[in-house]
Regions:
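Short glycine-rich phosphate-binding loop at a beta-alpha junction
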Residues: 445-452, 867-870
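DnaQ-like (DEDDh/DEDDy) 3′-5′ exonuclease domain used for proofreading
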Residues: 2-443, 570, 576-593, 600-645, ...
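Common nucleic-acid-contacting/processivity interface regions adjacent to the catalytic cores
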Residues: 2-9, 202-206, 551-688, 694, ...
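Conserved catalytic core of nucleic-acid polymerases
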Residues: 167, 175-195, 666-669, 675-680, ...
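HINT superfamily self-processing domains
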Residues: 873-1006
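Short active-site loop/helix that positions an aromatic residue
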Residues: 456-466, 667-681, 903
């Protein structure tokens, strides 16, 4: 295979350059970057923007000249000041900032130290650009379009940005309140320039980068002013280079590989010996611990202490005295372990332990083993960790699942592999550095793998440290040639993934994706093992190689190691193929651009930053400012009270094929609820003084919700809260409502663009838009400009799809991003850690949603004399009784004879449904509780939901995990809630006396 990166043509700086942004890097945010020791070394704010052109040429662009800023609302008493008095107070404040000190608190190791600090450090005067007065509106609460005087603090560096932020935070008690200091300056730059953070930009005025500190491995390295970067509309994605990697490791004991070994395994083995009843003394301890450096210490036929592998030659004359010194402590721990019985319930209740002193939980036993491990690790020689034996890498380019390059780096020899580069190394140190060099040559835009945030990257980092090559391995691992990357350990809590600890390399210019985390976030699966994911989504089951087989084959021949290599490359390629199949790049690029955050954020950050950036942009456009609200500050008096969530109507079970079924579905219920009642922070009346009676321009709507306290069975209603929201008579909406309207409208328009046709006239001119036939003419409507064009058919040369399949995929991903973002906005308003958290709006949204559902139900039942019911799918092997031409049959759905055709309109928004098909039988009727009913259509589709089999006295039913069942009281329960003995509600037929007998086959036919 040819190497995927080619030499780029020489840069012509006189020509415009266009590229798609892939990543953002802020040097001042880099904790590994050397801190300036003097003011002269301190740089002004820089942004590095990485991207790729339409020809696959990589670009690094340093953007200079942008000045970060935030706002401060002065004490309320200042609002009453005249302009002259306000100006005087401002001058006094500026003098204080420029000349004075303030008291700071330094916290370390749980201790606080107070000290005085100069507000603007000596020599950094130029980093403070200005402190001025501006007029803005407050996002937090309805103020009837009132402008307030705010202090705008503008700086030239991130260091000064944080300095001023800390200073004004110390002035909270004086009444100063910060606004938007929690918005990263580069996000604000994105907002101001109307740039899509993963979109296309054009730069006309630039020069080649000449600062070695910013030299990268990109094809073009350029420098420009922040005003020269402009957004452009390009409806495709650049040919991004996507690399996937996987590591294979050895294990000295045949168990799970450990990168840095201590004596935990020895401690566990000693615990087993202790529990077997063996007595310990100092000599026995010394014998065991000295033997394990040569061979297993065999205690009995089934009990041994495994051999260990020290880094260096063991000098027993040194370690023996250390063992004897600590022998008493070791014996004490082992004696305690030998006298316990383990309580598998892991019950830590103090009373129970006191009543049964010999009982110990698994957790408590692990603590004892950990103490023993600490002693052994302290006195005994350091051990070798389990080595990385192979690193596989595969590459594909966006737009195709074809693997354009394969590489395997192997410890020791490895046979050649067709269409793959095989590199054999004599040491693990060489192996790691070879892979680092490969990354430099490949220069991927995207680096992916499976569980790399949970295993691979941390393992590689530890092995680099153990081999004493961490600096060489990490330097230039990203795109900057001189920058040293680091392993980031990040704790992330989100609704999609729960609590997680991510461990990854902070690679500048390279977007790192752990496919496992994406699958866990976006899909519900029985198992998230790679082979199961591959089988579900691409129908390809990988050739598995068990861990013990890997360990055995590595010790074998070059051919054996080639088997491991093929397995490793296979895993890498599966990741590439799944990324392509599930359109992960399209979906996440669309989401990044909708929410105005970098692509990297979607894989390493929670939901909050996405929505916050979007809201901040809309606030900026409408001259509103968002206060910095920490949870303790924004808690209202009733905040600890709960509120009622969504409503679920009880289903009326049955198969409804005789009468037509009409589905009533709100288009995005919660967003629609918020739009309908203008539920937005800037329209929520918090201060009655702004609610003007008989205002000619504004009406006011009261929305109430029930307050609850307690949970579960103890939950009870404790009151009702009424909230007032401003309603503009001219149809204007609040900021949140406006955002939702925009998102839903853009989604609708984006979906329509997928249907665009290009009509080319005979004179070669062309028109794009939604095409409809009007007799002898075509009518073309263009969504962007609203123009309608009519063209006679006789003047038309051709009619073709405007967009190709790749472009349609981008639009499809974009419309999905609009939908998800609209639904996520409500969630962030109700999330206590969110910068826009406001419980009253979240509660009013759910209250309105419940009202809308009940309103629709009552309307249908009152005006159309209809029933509101629910339905669910059944498994294909479910038997049904049906008839055709007066002949009765009992058969399963999967055995129905007929022509199955694609049915894409069924549940289009359900990501868990694949390959939808329909079958429309002719003159077929099915038996229902209402008699014989004609079958309109039968629909079948794959699902990735769990299937539960529920057995009852009447038979069994197989249902999906979210299927609604009714308990004996008629309440809805899910299959997961069913236990043995749970009573379900049955619908039994009416029995009547009848003396005629039928045979078994007839009985089966009649059900």
């Amino acid at each position: 295979m040819d190497f995927p990166r080619k030499d780029a043509p020489t840069l012509d700086s006189s020509k415009e350059i266009q590229f798609q942004i892939t990543d953002w890097y802020i040097p001042e945010n880099d904790r590994n970057r050397k801190k300036p020791e003097t003011p002269e070394e301190a740089e002004f704010y820089n942004m590095i923007v990485y991207g790729t052109t339409n020809n696959g040429i990589t670009v690094s662009m340093r953007v200079t000249g942008y000045e970060p800023y935030f706002y401060v609302k002065p004490p309320e008493s200042w609002e009453k000041y005249s302009d002259k008095k306000f100006s005087s107070e401002m001058q006094s404040l500026i003098r204080v900032i420029e000349e004075d000190k303030y008291q700071c608190v330094f916290k370390r190791d749980g201790k606080s130290t107070q000290y005085w600090k100069k507000i603007v450090p000596n020599g950094y005067d130029e980093h403070l650009r200005s402190v001025t007065v501006v007029k803005k509106k407050d996002f937090w609460g309805f103020t009837n379009n009132t402008d307030f005087r705010f202090i705008k603090v503008t700086v030239r560096s991130l260091m000064m940005f944080n300095t001023m932020r800390y200073y004004f935070d110390s002035r909270k008690t004086d009444g100063f309140k910060m606004y938007e200091s929690n918005i990263d300056p580069f996000l604000r730059y994105i907002h101001e320039q109307n740039i899509k953070p993963c979109g296309w930009v054009s730069v006309t005025e630039y020069k080649e980068e000449d600062n070695d500190d910013y030299s990268t491995r990109c094809d073009y390295n350029i420098l420009t002013d922040h005003k020269n970067v402009n957004p452009i509309v390009v409806n495709n994605i650049a040919p991004l280079l996507v690399a996937s990697f996987d590591i294979e490791c050895m294990s000295s004991h045949g168990d799970f590989p450990v990168a840095k070994k201590d004596y935990r395994k020895v401690a566990q083995d000693l615990a087993i010996v202790a529990k077997a009843g063996y007595n310990f003394d100092a000599d026995f301890i010394s014998y065991c611990l000295e033997t394990i450096y040569k061979a297993d210490a065999q205690i009995d036929d089934g009990i041994k202490i495994h051999k260990v592998y020290p880094k260096n030659t063991v000098d027993f004359s040194i370690i023996r005295p250390k063992i004897m010194t600590e022998a008493d402590k070791i014996i004490e721990i082992l004696d305690e372990i030998s006298n316990i019985t383990v309580d598998d319930n892991d019950n830590d209740d103090d009373d129970e332990v006191a009543a049964a002193p010999k009982s110990m939980t698994v957790k408590q036993q692990n603590i004892l083993e950990s103490k023993l491990n600490s002693i052994l690790t302290k006195i005994l020689p350091p051990l070798k960790g389990d080595e990385i034996i192979q690193i596989g890498t595969t590459v594909h380019k966006y737009g195709s699942e074809e693997i354009v390059y394969k590489n395997i780096i192997s410890l020791n020899s490895c046979d050649a592999i067709k269409d793959a580069d095989v590199i054999s190394c004599k040491s693990e140190k060489q192996l790691l550095l070879e892979w680092r060099n490969l990354m430099g040559r490949l220069n991927p835009d995207i680096l992916s793998g499976y569980n790399i945030f949970g295993f691979d990257m941390e393992y590689m980092w530890i092995r680099a440290v153990e081999n004493k090559i961490a600096d060489d391995f990490l330097k230039g691992l990203g795109r900057n040639l001189t920058r040293k990357s680091d392993l980031i350990v990040q704790k992330l809590s989100s609704s999609a993934l729960g609590d997680n600890e991510l461990k990854y390399f902070d690679l500048d210019g390279i977007v790192v994706i752990d496919l496992l985390k994406v699958m866990q976030r976006d899909h519900k699966l029985d198992s998230y093992k790679l082979d199961n994911v591959a089988q579900v989504f691409i129908g390809d089951k990988k050739d598995d190689l068990k861990p013990h087989e890997i360990f055995k084959k590595f010790k074998g021949s070059s051919s054996d190691r080639c088997t491991i290599a093929n397995y490793c490359i296979q895993d890498c390629a599966l990741v590439n193929r799944i990324l392509h199949k599930l359109k992960i790049m399209e979906n996440n690029i669309g989401m990044a651009n909708v929410c105005l955050v970098p692509l990297n954020y979607l894989f390493k950050r929670g939901q909050g930053i996405k929505i916050f950036s979007l809201v901040a942009k809309q606030c900026m456009d409408r001259n509103h400012l968002i206060p910095v609200n920490k949870y303790a500050d924004m808690r209202l008096e009733s905040d600890m009270d709960g509120y009622e969530g969504a409503v679920v109507l009880e289903p009326k079970e049955g198969i409804y094929l005789d009468d037509p079924i009409v589905v009533f579905d709100y288009g995005s219920l919660y967003p629609s609820s918020m739009i309908a009642r203008n539920l937005s922070h800037d329209c929520y009346v918090m201060d009655k003084k702004y609610q003007v009676k008989d205002d000619p321009n504004i009406d006011y709507m009261t929305v109430s919700y029930d307050l609850y306290e307690g949970t579960g069975d103890k939950k009870k209603k404790v009151g009702v809260k009424e909230c007032v929201f401003a309603q503009y008579k001219d149809g204007r909406k609040g900021i949140i409502s406006d955002i939702l309207c925009m998102l839903l409208a853009e989604r609708k328009n984006t979906r329509k663009k997928m249907e665009y046709k290009t009509i080319t006239r005979n004179n070669k001119s062309a028109v794009n838009g939604i095409v409809s036939e009007k007799g002898s003419s075509y009518e073309i409507f263009n969504i962007e400009n609203g123009n309608t064009t009519t063209i006679p058919k006789k003047d038309v040369a051709s009619v073709k799809d405007t967009y190709n399949n790749f472009e349609k995929d981008v639009f499809d991903a974009l419309q999905l991003a609009y939908k998800i973002t609209a639904n996520s906005l409500y969630g962030q308003i109700g999330a206590r850690t969110s910068p826009i958290y406001l419980k009253d709006i979240a509660a009013c949204t759910t209250a309105t949603g419940r009202e809308m559902i009940m309103l629709a139900k009552d309307f249908v039942e009152t005006n159309y004399n209809a029933e509101v019911i629910y339905g669910d799918s059944v498994m294909p092997y479910t038997p049904i009784t049906y008839r055709t031409s007066d002949q009765l049959y009992v058969n399963t759905f999967e055995k129905l004879e007929g022509q199955w055709t694609a049915y894409e309109k069924f549940k289009q928004s359900d990501a868990n449904i694949y390959n939808k098909e329909q079958f429309q039988p002719i003159n077929m009727e099915v038996w229902t509780h209402r008699g014989w009913s004609k079958i309109a259509r039968v629909i079948r589709h794959k699902t990735v939901k769990k299937i539960y089999r529920v057995y009852t006295e009447s038979g069994c039913v197989d249902v999906t995990e979210d299927h609604s069942l009714l308990d004996i009281t008629g309440n809805i329960i899910k299959p997961v809630d069913c236990m043995i003995g749970t009573s379900l509600l049955h619908s039994r037929p009416q029995y009547c006396a009848y003396d005629k007998k039928i045979d078994i086959n007839q009985a089966y036919i009649y059900g």
